[in-house]
């Protein structure tokens, strides 16, 4: 039996290598998809839409429930929610059996104002010391004003820890956004990586903060059951001098408790965490990234901590693309890339996820260290732009021509991606197009880890 098992494992790996060669043969040309999405309304869903999970505020039921990894290594989960009538009900009870809660913790409670808006009571509770690979049941709130959910913790950090990550950005709250979220909840994804531009509340004249409430209601069927890891984009800045609000990222910082301090960062805009077999580093275009800056020095330090024998996958999260052949935001990220690319390539990062451009694009491994504008570099990451979540600004379908040699596949459609990390050497990447309401895999490739393979 051991010999037979070895045979099938060898056969499986051989098939992967063949598929990889077929998908991305050396010197292959990129593809510009000819798919044209059927036009439909891209305006925001009304505040009373059935897509938003809403309760009578006087009942003080927890709403907008969302989970975030709360530490560096995946043994803490932060539970966040909102109540409206009072700050009471600030309890999370949890345990390994349904209706049998062996632990409880009180939440920290905060509020904020923005213009004439006052938020509900925003709760954050850290569930610490959790066992890896374990399903926990939890209840938020008290008595009749409570709700119950469950989540499964990630596997212990290690080189062959398998895990399925979802990736999206620029989501908004249109019918297209709702379809993206609904498709993702059925995809088998276990942790979502969100690379910026969230509610698009700033599309409203007064930066309508109510749209943060509706947006989190839209997501709850996923966010209450698995961690979403957040990266801020330009639509989270929300500081407008004519509104009297000058504090940047106010709603982001109040609502989304990313674990930046756990990685020694002093800002929620850039931080790192480990999950399964991957080491994630989120960096920010919207903070000083110049050589010698606080962010630059932090990134240098964090990259020096990466242990590829423990976390063979090194994945970068950042909102503005460094390689983008769409005419929208074309070359916007070049300045940041020129400063930080040497660090990223020297570290042999595997994948770089970005958003910002409302279309989809995947590149071959490329850098500009030995050329201008991007050429093949096996030490460089695969760049994936996933700013196609569904927001009200719509799609941008104009790409530069001819297609640059670094560009492998590009299409202006709504959708999301999954990264199925199988082991230390192989991950199956799929981009799921929202094909007129159905989830369709439109781009698929095996990504081979260059350090471990």
What is each of the regions a protein language model found here?
Residues 167-169, 192-197, 228-234, 284, ...:
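Active-site neighborhood of phospho(di)ester-bond hydrolases with catalytic His/Asp-centered motifs
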Residues 121-128, 132-159, 206, 210-309, ...:
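Extended active-site neighborhood of metal-dependent phosphoesterases/phosphodiesterases
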Residues 309-352:
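Active-site-proximal segments of metal-dependent phosphoesterases and phosphodiesterases across multiple
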Residues 86, 144, 199, 236-237, ...:
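Short, solvent-exposed loop/turn segments at secondary-structure junctions
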Residues 75-78, 88-91, 101-102, 174-177, ...:
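Short, solvent-exposed loop/turn elements at domain surfaces
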Residues 86, 186, 222-225, 308, ...:
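Alpha-helix termination/capping residues and helix-transition junctions
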Residues 2-167, 186, 412, 418-422, ...:
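Acidic, histidine-bearing metal-coordination/catalytic regions of metal-dependent phosphoesterases
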Residues 161-231, 236-237:
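Conserved, compact domain cores that house catalytic/ligand-binding motifs in diverse enzymes
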């Amino acid at each position: 039996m051991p010999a037979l098992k070895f045979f099938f494992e060898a056969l499986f790996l051989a098939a992967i290598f063949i598929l990889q060669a077929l998908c991305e043969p050396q010197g292959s040309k990129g593809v510009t998809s000819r798919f044209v999405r059927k036009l439909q309304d891209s305006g925001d869903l009304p505040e009373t839409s059935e897509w938003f999970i809403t309760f009578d505020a006087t009942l003080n039921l927890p709403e907008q429930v969302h989970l975030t990894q709360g530490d560096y290594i995946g043994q803490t989960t932060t539970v966040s929610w909102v109540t409206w009538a009072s700050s009471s009900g600030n309890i999370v009870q949890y345990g390994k059996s349904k209706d049998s809660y062996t632990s409880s913790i009180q939440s920290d409670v905060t509020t904020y104002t923005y213009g004439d808006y006052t938020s509900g009571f925003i709760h954050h509770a850290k569930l610490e010391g959790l066992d890896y690979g374990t399903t926990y049941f939890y209840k938020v709130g008290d008595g009749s004003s409570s709700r119950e959910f469950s989540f499964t913790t990630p596997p212990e950090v290690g080189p062959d820890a398998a895990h399925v990550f979802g990736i999206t950005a620029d989501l908004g709250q249109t019918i297209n956004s709702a379809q993206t979220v609904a498709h993702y909840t059925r995809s088998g994804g276990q942790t979502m990586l969100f690379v910026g531009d969230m509610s698009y509340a700033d599309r409203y004249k007064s930066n309508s903060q109510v749209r943060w409430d509706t947006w989190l209601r839209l997501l709850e069927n996923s966010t209450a059951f698995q961690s979403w890891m957040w990266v801020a984009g330009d639509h989270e800045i929300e500081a407008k001098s004519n509104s009297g609000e000058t504090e940047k990222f106010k709603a982001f910082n109040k609502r989304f408790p990313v674990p930046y301090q756990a990685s020694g960062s002093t800002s929620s805009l850039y931080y790192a965490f480990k999950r399964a077999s991957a080491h994630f580093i989120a960096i920010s275009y919207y903070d000083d990234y110049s050589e010698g800056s606080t962010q630059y020095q932090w990134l240098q330090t964090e990259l020096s901590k990466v242990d590829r024998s423990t976390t063979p996958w090194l994945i970068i999260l950042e909102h503005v693309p460094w390689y983008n052949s769409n005419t929208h935001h074309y070359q916007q990220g070049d300045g940041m890339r020129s400063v930080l690319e040497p660090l990223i390539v020297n570290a042999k990062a595997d994948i770089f996820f970005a958003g910002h451009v409302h279309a989809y694009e995947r590149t071959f491994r490329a850098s500009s260290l030995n050329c201008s504008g991007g050429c093949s570099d096996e030490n460089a990451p695969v760049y994936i732009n996933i700013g196609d979540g569904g927001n009200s600004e719509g799609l941008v379908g104009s790409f530069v021509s001819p297609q640059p040699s670094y560009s492998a596949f590009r299409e202006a459609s709504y959708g999301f991606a999954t990264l199925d990390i199988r082991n230390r050497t192989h991950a199956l990447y799929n981009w799921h197009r929202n094909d007129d309401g159905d989830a369709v895999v439109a781009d698929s490739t095996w990504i081979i880890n260059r350090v471990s393979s």
